[in-house]
């Protein structure tokens, strides 16, 4: 198929739903045109706007397309192999460890070209999914990643100077959910994860490594899986049936869900030709043989038939739901309390008035809180001041008492010094009188005189030491 024909085919699919809806409601449209005073006219000659589809095709081919796939499944279940087989390309994805402490999402973008149609393909792999002992929150990193891509697109959309034409749209268009071929039922982790993802992304469940289960068990397993999904309220992607050209095929494919797939890039010789297959001792499982697996059906509905619908559903359903919830959280609404239309300016003014009132209320609360805290601080400071004053008075009283004690001791010491001085003077007078009285006798007795002089010298030294 030529590139222009591929683009026309994609655009034709994207617009057929609108066309069919318009044809089915033609009567109501006529009444609406009458109410709006719109007239239908027939032109007398060729004008040229019939080339609008061709213009759209040419511009789309020039711009290129993007498609983002999220692969969710346990490590080693065959996610990378299936993607390689789907796009007939070796994306060189490295093997992941089974010992990751947390679930991480790894995104890789590739540029592919078929004829002259360019496709920017992003593959997001869930590294470490299902490898933890506690798997209760394993789905949360996936939900956060999808919401982050929606938020990035919303922020770009809300910019004053936005450039959506050159913006790399990283929103997830489809989630291929890989189910282990146990043959029994869905794991609790699978149900919990798909339940939290069904409102955010288009989910297509696939049974991985379907060649490990017999055909009879596989058919029973499919019925069991769909029954569990329905009973638990999990909404998986349904291929659209409103386009007459593909309605029959998509209706049949909806009855084949979940697809049982086998992936392989190895080629095995079967008969006179080489085919992609998996070689076993008991035989060969051909990837593109519909009697062996549903790989061809998956590739047909995912890439050839419904790729544009997946892109459109992502934008019109899942992104719009996220956008609406975000704007409602911000206070924006389409109708007022009386169910009257509300313009963006009115909503802005209402929110501005609300924020102004909230700001004034917060300022008043902060002022009151500040005054209260100042009063509390002043009370604490006054109490501390009283305690310091009491301590000061106590220390002052102790100082005065100590000073009075020292003063009394000083007076007693002075009295003792005066008394000692009097005793010393009396002793000196006594010694002088004794010396004069015995002076004449000492002259007569030289030895006695020498003894008396030594005696008085010793007594004088003793008195000096006492002073």
Swiss-Prot record:
It is found in: Cytoplasm; Cytoplasm, Cytoskeleton; Cell projection, Cilium, Flagellum. This is Septin-10. The keyword Oxidoreductase does not apply. GO terms for biological process: cell division. It comes from Pongo abelii. Septins polymerize into heterooligomeric protein complexes that form filaments, and can associate with cellular membranes, actin filaments and microtubules. GTPase activity is required for filament formation. Interacts with ADGB. The gene is SEPTIN10. The keyword Repressor does not apply. Pfam families: Septin. Belongs to the TRAFAC class TrmE-Era-EngA-EngB-Septin-like GTPase superfamily. Septin GTPase family.
């Amino acid at each position: 198929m030529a590139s222009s024909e591929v683009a026309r085919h994609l655009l034709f699919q994207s617009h057929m739903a609108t066309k069919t809806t318009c044809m089915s409601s033609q009567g109501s449209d006529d009444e609406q045109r009458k109410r709006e005073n719109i007239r239908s006219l027939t032109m007398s000659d060729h004008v040229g706007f019939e080339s609008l589809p061709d213009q759209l095709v040419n511009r789309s081919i020039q711009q290129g397309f993007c498609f983002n796939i999220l692969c969710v499944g346990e490590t080693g279940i065959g996610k990378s192999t299936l993607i390689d087989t789907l796009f007939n390309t070796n994306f060189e994805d490295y093997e992941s460890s089974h010992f990751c402490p947390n679930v991480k999402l790894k995104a890789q973008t590739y540029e592919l070209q078929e004829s002259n149609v360019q496709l920017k393909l992003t593959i997001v792999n869930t590294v470490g999914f299902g490898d933890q002992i506690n798997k209760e929150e394993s789905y949360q990193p996936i939900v956060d990643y999808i919401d982050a891509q929606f938020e990035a697109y919303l922020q770009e959309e809300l910019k004053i100077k936005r450039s959506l034409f050159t913006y790399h749209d990283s929103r997830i268009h489809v989630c291929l959910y890989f189910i282990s071929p146990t043959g029994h039922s869905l794991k609790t982790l699978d149900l919990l994860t798909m339940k939290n993802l069904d409102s955010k992304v288009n989910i297509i469940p696939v049974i991985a490594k379907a060649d490990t289960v017999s055909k009879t068990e596989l058919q029973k397993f499919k019925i069991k899986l769909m029954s569990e999904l329905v009973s638990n309220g999990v909404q998986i992607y349904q291929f659209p049936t409103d386009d007459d050209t593909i309605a029959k095929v998509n209706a049949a494919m909806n009855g084949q869900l979940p697809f049982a797939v086998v992936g392989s890039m190895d080629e095995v010789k079967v008969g006179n030709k080489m085919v992609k297959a998996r070689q076993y001792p008991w035989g060969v499982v051909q990837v593109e043989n519909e009697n062996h697996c549903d790989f061809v059906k998956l590739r047909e509905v995912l890439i050839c038939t419904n790729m544009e619908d997946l892109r459109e559903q992502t934008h019109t359903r899942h992104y719009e739901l996220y956008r609406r919830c975000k704007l409602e959280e911000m206070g924006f609404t389409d109708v007022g309390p009386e169910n009257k239309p509300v313009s963006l300016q009115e909503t802005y003014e209402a929110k501005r008035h609300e924020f102004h009132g909230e700001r004034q209320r917060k300022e008043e609360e902060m002022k009151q809180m500040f005054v209260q805290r100042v009063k509390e601080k002043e009370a604490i400071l006054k109490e501390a001041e009283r305690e310091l004053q009491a301590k000061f008075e106590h220390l002052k009283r102790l100082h005065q008492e100590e000073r009075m004690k020292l003063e009394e001791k000083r007076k007693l010491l002075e009295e003792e010094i005066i008394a000692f001085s009097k005793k010393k003077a009396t002793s000196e007078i006594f010694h002088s009188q004794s010396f004069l009285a015995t002076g004449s006798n000492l002259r007569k007795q030289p030895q006695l005189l020498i003894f008396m002089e030594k005696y008085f010298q010793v007594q004088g030294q003793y008195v000096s030491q006492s002073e």
